[in-house]
Amino acid sequence: MAKSDGDDPLRPASPRLRSSRRHSLRYSAYTGGPDPLAPPVDLRDALEQIGQDVMAGASPRRALSELLRRGTRNLTGADRLAAEVNRRRRELLRRNNLDGTLQEIKKLLDEAVLAERKELARALDDDARFAELQLDALPVSPAKAVQELAEYRWRSGQAREKYEQIKDLLGRELLDQRFAGMKQALAGATDDDRRRVTEMLDDLNDLLDKHARGEDTQRDFDEFMTKHGEFFPENPRNVEELLDSLAKRAAAAQRFRNSLSQEQRDELDALAQQAFGSPALMRALDRLDAHLQAARPGEDWTGSQQFSGDNPFGMGEGTQALADIAELEQLAEQLSQSYPGASMDDVDLDALARQLGDQAAVDARTLAELERALVNQGFLDRGSDGQWRLSPKAMRRLGETALRDVAQQLSGRHGERDHRRAGAAGELTGATRPWQFGDTEPWHVARTLTNAVLRQAAAVHDRIRITVEDVEVAETETRTQAAVALLVDTSFSMVMENRWLPMKRTALALHHLVCTRFRSDALQIIAFGRYARTVTAAELTGLAGVYEQGTNLHHALALAGRHLRRHAGAQPVVLVVTDGEPTAHLEDFDGDGTSVFFDYPPHPRTIAHTVRGFDDMARLGAQVTIFRLGSDPGLARFIDQVARRVQGRVVVPDLDGLGAAVVGDYLRFRRR
């Protein structure tokens, strides 16, 4: 985006401004929040993934959660964001340690003593020798050495300056623990600056005293911020917000202390009394900590972390690192989405941007928008039992996707031709329309050629080239109705052999084709395992695999017969998808019974009942096609014999081609 210094980047400049500032334009990445030119959330891809998980047996709520965790082809998921969060946390602990302030104090102390020794070496008086003895007797502990040198009369100006830097450093580090950025802000500060800090702490403690007693007013807070607002870049609007920001930082400072060894704590406690040359600062901070712990007991005041790296952090840096770690742990929990009522809206986008950058926040925001869009646009419904379900709109979209995949497979078959002819499909109305996949109406040759000629009018060609976009078909008023029974095997072997999803996608594709292109046809989906039952496309989509014995094709054929008899005037079609021999049957042939007989290998009675079921389909005049999955020789023998008996067809597709085989067979029948 082009920017001109001092201009609103979203407001076009006047011609005169553009002319006078032509060479001051700068181009850079957009940084004003979410990309305004970014494409909308891809719900089609998201819904397809949710549908795959639901068909595999997950609940819609679980499928949505898994989608948000995985992400999509163009969108980072919550799991990857959480992995980045955990990686950053590990790096903070692995690369750093909390010894920085003590190391810096020891360095300044060594420099001060060395400079003083050099100065004393040039002196010849007895006082210089006595001073050397004092320096030789300094304790190894930096804290005790600093205390003993408090009354020492320095001869070297450089040494005195180094020693004063120690007290100044301690004061700035202590303040930096509670107020981020104070170490740098007070570098080279004057006595007046230090007095202003002390005055701010006194006024802050007085304000919190009044708040604890319930005597403070908004005016008290406003007056405090008017006087000391420069110390609070977070710009709190009231005392409660002020307490929130201060308590988070103070709790991190306490965790810093908890993470130190006992020796380090003792050293820093002793050194803290020398901050800014007196214990007053430490007393004010202790008073502030007491207020904050009482006001915000829910903060983590007792936690600690184990740092193991070589990079030394000072007290302020270490406190910030512990605050970052706490924020990262909170983000990891939010991104895990593993708690009751979890939602991507729970993720703190500002914190995520601070820790991982703006792109991570954009990804998380997009995931939240995706979650809301799926609900708000009607793809997920909550039932009366409180459970989420795929809505009819979602089912149509899934069916459309499944049918599109099938159409691509059918169009990619080499050496096949679709021969269409008018007749039984219906009476011509005289109107035409563009061809769509699944149409059985005859081409309107005149309109098709006209479209091809007009499309190529601007170019010179020796011949007319016809594309799919040119084709128009003649509309018809009526169409012969078909009664279609799709029998799908839902026994556990379908799950174990990875045939579950292809079977469901096949049923969805056929259901969508019938509902959109052959609305007069009556499609009934029948699922059969130990028992058979009629199911809707939505019920089949959400059907979970159950381990139970039995492939009751006999029961399924009985239900198919009922469906065909209900539509006696329609042309009957029976499509069977199965991967195993019939091993169960109903003891009541009419399909009303609940007593199931099971045996393996298939019992002759089961075979006989199933064959009679196929005979019933033949008596009804049904066109029967059986789609055999797998290479079970027993099933192959049985299916081949039954197909010859009822003059049906046997198709042996691979799993990827199952949908194309079933839909293609149905279309072949509709074109007869």
UniProtKB/Swiss-Prot annotation:
Stretches the record annotates as Disordered: 1-40
Protein name per UniProt: Uncharacterized protein MT0986
Database matches in SUPFAM superfamilies: vWA-like (SSF53300)
InterPro entries referenced in this protein's UniProt entry, alphabetically: VWF_A (IPR002035), vWFA_dom_sf (IPR036465)
Compositional bias of kind Basic and acidic residues: 1-10
Entry superkingdom: Bacteria
